[in-house]
Amino acid sequence: MVHWADYMAEKIIRERGDKEEYVVESGITPSGYVHIGNFREFFTAYIVGHALRDRGKRVRHIHMWDDYDRFRKVPKNVPPEWKEHLTKPVREVPDPWGCHESYADHFMSLFEEEISKLGIEADFLHASELYKSGEYAKEIRLALEKRDEIKAILDKYRERAKQPPLEDSWQPVMIYCPHCRKEAEFVSWDGEWKVSYKCPHCGAEGETDIREGNVKLRWRVDWPMRWAHFKVDFEPAGKDHLAAGSSYDTGKEIVEKVFGWKAPLTLMYEFVGIKGQKGKMSGSKGNVILLSDLYEVLEPGIIRFIYAKARPNKELRIDLGLGLLNLYDEFDRVERIYFGLEHAKNPEEEEELKRTYELSMPKLPERLVAQAPFRFLVTLVQMPHLDEDGIIRILQEQGHVPENLTDDDIERIKLRIRLAKNWVEKYAPDDVKFSLLERPPEIELRPEIREAMLEVAEWLEEHERFSVDELNNVIFDAAKKRGIPSKEWFKALYNIFIGKDRGPRLAPFLASLNREFVIKRLRLEG
């Protein structure tokens, strides 16, 4: 099967023709934290650009910060007095936390920092700078000249949606008051470069030159204008922008009839959420998961893998609970398939999985770097007697990583150790968490179980070195020969070590503990 990004890249080349440079675009209004749902738009544009580059094409990925949009409402996590800044450009609203030049910069800088960890580069542009520099001045004037044509297009779609037409006073632009910087009322246009305004906030009246940057195109005109200005070939969009009669439909007509360019190809991307979290994430509401939250428990390549393997038009729910362990298992399997150490069900699946891995890695490794099983690390990081070196030693003894480790191997293992610790602290359900009991609990055990425990203890005393499989067989045989049901037997063993009825896989767990400690505990001596 062809990966969806490759399919899109081929379609772009086929429909846009052979070009010297292809332009892909993404865009976000920094009105709140840029969350993992917003990231889907950015990554979809990036990965399609990646697929184009893999075909030898030159690609420019523009990420447009729509920081000249109005500050529409005060989020819950912002002081209420920030309402005095409503309708100003978000780039000109002060940072409530006092650490950045503006409200918008606070969110933009964090996202750009997060992106760099994923090995992704893009051309970050700021709408505020483009408008203020006069870059869009000719297009603004053109939109004013063709105001009636634009209004007719918008009204046509409004009629189809059974909505009333736009008011006769409607204009394709909005104005920021040069004095107080809040949204002013449009009065008139002189037919050339000046528009008259009246500010309902500070009372100022006058003229402003389009080239001075106080005049901004409204969204449904701004978007198609950008497509033409930057010669955009591809831009993904959320389903709200791609519904019938929405901004993509109107933009498609406006860009052709007003700005003389063909609308870019697009892909609809679906909602991204966290499994178990109700409702849609909102950067202004504050109920968001950021890329930096994912970095606490996932390798960068696995974050990219989540988005690369899922078709954009499918809803994506990231499981930070037990499902995260399955995600690590899945990624490690795909990585082994890529390096030829395992095989998929069939050649088609293998080809797609290998391609997904290529698109997932910030930098493709030349070999398989040591994979410390995340599930097992979740157990090991909860053992107080093990530091990082001790954990690595256990991994080597039990055959999970090679005896001879390179710096890259050690770096990756230590990263996973830190991620496993974070996961246990932040997301692990209670039945996964445990702590070793300092002394045996006072519980009643029937004689057969005591005998089985002593048998395992004697075997351990006779064997300084052993494999996990050997220990596993001894544990099962000791119970089987005495007719002890497995459930009862394991419950007893977990209780004497961690005081719970269930726990991590028993044989690897016991093999990770000090042998003398295990022997004494099985004898209920300490």
From Swiss-Prot:
Subcellular location: Cytoplasm
Pfam family, one: tRNA-synt_1f
Main location: cytoplasm
Cofactor note as given: Binds 2 Zn(2+) ions per subunit.
Short motif ('KMSKS' region): ranges: 280-284
Domain of life: Archaea
Entries under InterPro entries matching the protein: aa-tRNA-synth_I_cd-bd, aa-tRNA-synth_I_codon-bd_sub2, aa-tRNA-synth_I_CS, aa_tRNA-synth_I_cd-bd_sf, Lys-tRNA-ligase, Lys-tRNA-ligase_SC_fold, Rossmann-like_a/b/a_fold
Keyword Nucleotide-binding: yes
Renumbered ranges of motif 'HIGH' region: 30-38
Enzyme class of the recorded protein, top EC level: ligase
Family of the protein in this entry: Belongs to the class-I aminoacyl-tRNA synthetase family.
Record's protein name: Lysine--tRNA ligase
